[in-house]
Amino acid sequence: MKSYEFVLRRLATILSVAIISLSVMAAVTGILLSFYYEPVAGRAYQSLNWIDTEIPNGLLIHSIHDIAGNALIVTALIQIVVMFLGRQFRSSWLTAWISGILLTLTGIGLSWTAIILDWSQVGYWRFRIELSTIEAIPFIGGTLRNILTGGGAVNTTTVAHLYTIHSYLLSVGAIALAIVHLWGLLQQEKEMKGNAVEAVAKSEKLQQQRNFSQTLS
């Protein structure tokens, strides 16, 4: 049982390091893309196509950005399952667990806000359909729609709003949550090692007391 828990803790830590690596990879490639990307309706598609075809290694950077973003979500979901199987009811585990869930939701948010950034036909109509679903949410649907679109039709303002949310708010949040997540796991590992050392010390002390009692008798 202890070996099983040890493997799960090690796997959780490895996945957490992978999550941070993917977050940094997505952030760095996103910054490189932002030098040439134009968050303007009608020109967003052309700018991305120009990056892919004219900029040296542009297609590679664009592909790495997409793959890292998708891999982040998959890795975070696997991480949640691993942490659930090896759950320890302590504050460090709870910190890692909650930050892991929030990180997964942030990754999904990053993926969702990117669907219209290329201003393709597929992305445009998919966003329109999902925007209707958001608008149907009671009480806050209209407000959310105005935040995303800028209060009007789906146009340049919408692209600019989603670009800001994607590139600044969610990206910074993802990196921060990944760091908190790893910190929680490392704290849990530290606590487990401390408990193990304490248990060994107590066992040795008891053994010494028994040996001393046997010597006296």
Label for each model-derived stretch:
Residues M1-S217:
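Membrane-embedded alpha-helical bundles that constitute the cytochrome b-like, heme-associated redox core
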